[in-house]
A protein has these predicted regions:
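Preference for extracellular/luminal or secreted protein segments
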Residues: 1-50, 280-494
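Active-site mouth loops of central-metabolism enzymes
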Residues: 28-40, 106-120, 201-214, 274-282
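A short aromatic-anchored loop/beta-hairpin motif
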Residues: 33-37, 51-65, 75
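Short glycine-enriched loops at secondary-structure junctions
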Residues: 36-39, 85-93, 97, 135-145, ...
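Catalytic domains of carbohydrate-active enzymes, especially glycoside hydrolases
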Residues: 46-58, 124-126, 131-136
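Second-shell residues forming the walls of enzyme active-site clefts
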Residues: 60-77, 81-83, 91-95, 160-325
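A charged helix-plus-loop insertion that forms the helical arch/lid used to bind
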Residues: 99-113, 157-159
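Alpha-helical scaffold segments that flank or form the walls of functional sites
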Residues: 113-134, 216, 287-293
Length: 494
């Protein structure tokens, strides 16, 4: 099959599988597909005309805001799609994928702990999304980050207190939805206590149901009460709830807990099914069927599935109905929820002009300085390279844009020569920039070597400030967004 062939071609053909074109349309309507490039391929446009649920955009779909607006307009011409992306502020951004976000992320907002500020920041982000034609934001993150070494949440979380996370999640939901952008609160029932990345494997949340209710579920309960339009499922296993299944595939999680116990009747969206927790356990197509049967309404496929994969998933869903493993009524229920969401889109839209200003204000309020930096003398900056997570991608970070007068080198900690770096920094101000040093032993070792010779050096931590070495000055930004970096440099140069 050609890579550009319509993945739904044949869906209206009575000879195709069940012979029910309406059923094929229902199956297609449950999919949020993705594609490469900055313009929509023909197969996507034809698919939207034939009932595909919508699209999820990634960094590779973005050149600038004007281009995204044009892309979204073309998608909306083809149908009534959900047009979504991950815009969390901080490290995870799609609109600012090539520059870094003008807004700090949740950890910075949680550190400030001003819910009015959080609402204003999310409202400003929502205005950006409105201008770009997006109608659903895959955010906010409502995970309570209780595992210091969590490889995938970290600064994406408001913090480790359920109550703090809950009140800021509510503020974020209000900020987004007051501008007409549907919030998608994630990752249910909670990804904050994990030590693994669900992009790579099935993480484990080893918590009793009572602990879940006291900790992980507190922000989700608050978000539901605040009217969150959608909630994203997590590919995490909670033995007390899901057994060995990821929550995305668990009826106990999505139907019994979320729908019945918590009383949620909004749209349930899966995390990307191409993540290894699903694709390398039950597979994409079977994962789609199991997620729908569990209670999901929209299936985010992620960036990897091809047009052929999409066609195969539609066929597999239709086959599952024919085999009695999934009911047409379940698909109709999902479609009705998504249709209600579409009817809500744009009902309330408000323009704001704060943008970068509110983002920088929030970053300035979050950044903290311990010790004294002193005047900078011919600064030499060592940025310690940190491998990006899949959720973040190759978003630029660091202080370089804001310190044009400095000599800046970026090094891999396992390859760096501390002696050579110290030689270059002789008689100069030494600034060491790192992200999440607490999770990277090689980074900590290099910093310790540098500080042993230069205890007057400044350390700028652009992740979570958990490991605090004895430095002349220690700056914590609570995130690596462009706004966080600027706020840190302002402290250094004040």
């Amino acid at each position: 099959m050609s890579a550009t062939r319509d993945p739904l071609a044949g869906a209206a053909d009575p000879s195709t599988r069940t012979g029910d074109p309406g059923l094929h349309r229902l199956a297609a309507g449950a999919l949020l597909i993705s594609f490469r490039g900055t313009t929509a391929p023909d197969w996507v446009l034809r698919g939207l005309e034939d009932g595909l649920g919508g699209v999820c955009l990634f960094g590779f779909n973005v050149a600038d805001g004007e281009q995204v607006a044009a892309l979204s307009a073309r998608l909306h011409e083809a149908g009534r799609p959900v047009v979504s992306l991950d815009e969390e502020g901080g490290d995870v951004t799609r609109l600012a994928y090539h520059t870094g976000s003008a807004y700090p992320g949740n950890a910075a907002l949680g550190a400030v702990d001003d819910v009015a500020l959080t609402e204003r920041v999310y409202h400003a982000m929502a205005a950006d999304l409105v201008r770009c034609g997006v109608n659903l934001d895959m955010g906010p993150v409502a995970d309570v980050n209780t595992a210091d070494d969590n490889p995938i949440i970290g600064t994406r979380s408001f913090g480790s207190s359920p109550e703090l996370v809950a009140r800021h999640t509510v503020a974020a939901v209000r900020g987004l939805q007051s501008a007409g952008i549907a919030a998608c609160v994630k990752h249910f029932p909670g990804h904050g206590a994990t030590h693994q990345d669900s992009h790579l494997e099935i993480p484990l949340v080893d918590a009793s149901l009572d602990l879940l209710r006291e900790r992980e579920l507190v922000p989700f309960r608050a978000a539901i009460e605040a009217g969150a339009k959608s909630i994203m499922s997590a590919h995490v296993a909670v033995p007390s709830l899901t057994g060995t299944l990821p929550a995305t595939l668990s009826r106990e999680t999505l139907t019994r807990l979320l729908r019945r116990e918590l009383g949620y009747d909004g749209v349930v969206i899966t995390d990307a099914l191409d993540m290894h927790a699903i694709s390398r356990s039950v597979g994409l197509a079977e994962g789609a069927v199991m997620a729908l049967a569990a209670g999901a309404d929209l299936l985010c496929l992620g960036p990897l599935p091809t047009p052929e994969d999409v066609r195969g998933m539609v066929d597999h869903i239709v086959d599952a109905v024919a085999e009695g493993r999934l009911t047409a009524e379940r698909l109709e229920e999902a479609a009705a929820r998504v249709e209600r969401l579409r009817d809500w889109f744009g009902a309330t839209r408000a323009e704001v002009a704060e943008g970068d200003v509110i983002g920088l204000d929030a970053a300035r309020r979050a950044v903290s300085l311990t010790g004294s930096a002193g005047p900078l003398v011919d600064p030499f900056v060592v940025e310690i390279d940190t491998p990006p997570t899949i959720a973040v991608g190759e978003v630029p970070w660091g202080v370089a844009p804001w310190l044009p007068q400095a000599e800046i080198v970026r090094v891999k900690p396992e390859e760096a020569d501390a002696g050579a770096l110290l030689g270059r920094a002789r008689d100069r101000s030494l600034i060491v920039v790192v992200k999440d040093a607490h999770r990277h032993p090689d980074s900590r070792e290099l910093i310790s070597e540098l500080l042993a010779a230069r205890p007057d050096a400044v350390v700028v931590e652009m992740g979570l400030p958990i490991w605090r070495p004895g430095a002349g000055a220690y700056i914590a930004t609570y995130g690596a967004a462009r706004a966080n970096a600027r706020a840190a440099v302002e402290l250094l140069t004040a």
